[in-house]
């Protein structure tokens, strides 16, 4: 709760609808990863080591078992927007604090990204995002949406540029 804190606990549908209202869209998973990496090839956009000054994650003040006890980012829960330095593209808060939804569906069964176009893959079943009604139900293997970036209550490993989470 606070004007400078990120919006949290938003469904994928609400995030998509907000973007549509603003005449925008959620980024694809490929677009998000390109943006967060900021032109780097390291584990995290700032390098390969975490000191606690790069983003908000489950650190020494976190009460969960997955905490990283050796570092502190200075926040027990969410941090005010802009509390950490930007990535090389000048983008703030791309990792940690709260997860970020992307457009893609997760295809567990077929491992879409092994067979997808290498440049700008659209993600499996993008047509489902503009369709409504029972005939639009995804296949058994495509039932999850993807979020990226990690959050204040996630391990530091989830801040990796390549990490992905999924939810129904």
Segments from the language model and where they lie:
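Functional-site microenvironments in short loops/helix caps that host divalent-cation chemistry
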Residues: 1-165
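Short surface loop/edge beta-strand patches of beta-sandwich-type extracellular domains
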Residues: 168
């Amino acid at each position: 709760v606070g004007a400078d804190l990120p919006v949290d606990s938003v469904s994928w549908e609400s995030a998509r609808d907000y973007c549509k209202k603003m005449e925008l869209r959620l980024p694809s998973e490929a677009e998000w990863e390109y943006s967060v990496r900021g032109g780097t090839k390291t584990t995290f956009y700032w390098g390969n080591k975490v000191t606690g000054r790069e983003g908000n994650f489950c650190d020494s003040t976190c009460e969960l078992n997955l905490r990283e006890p050796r570092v502190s980012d200075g926040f027990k829960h969410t941090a005010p927007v802009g509390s950490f330095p930007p990535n090389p593209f000048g983008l703030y808060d791309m990792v940690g604090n709260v997860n970020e939804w992307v457009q893609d569906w997760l295809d567990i069964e077929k491992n879409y990204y092994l067979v997808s176009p290498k440049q700008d893959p659209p993600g499996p079943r993008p047509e489902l995002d503009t369709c409504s009604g029972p005939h639009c139900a995804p296949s058994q293997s495509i039932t999850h949406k993807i979020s990226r970036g990690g959050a204040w209550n996630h391990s530091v490993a989830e801040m990796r540029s390549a990490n992905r989470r999924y939810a129904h």
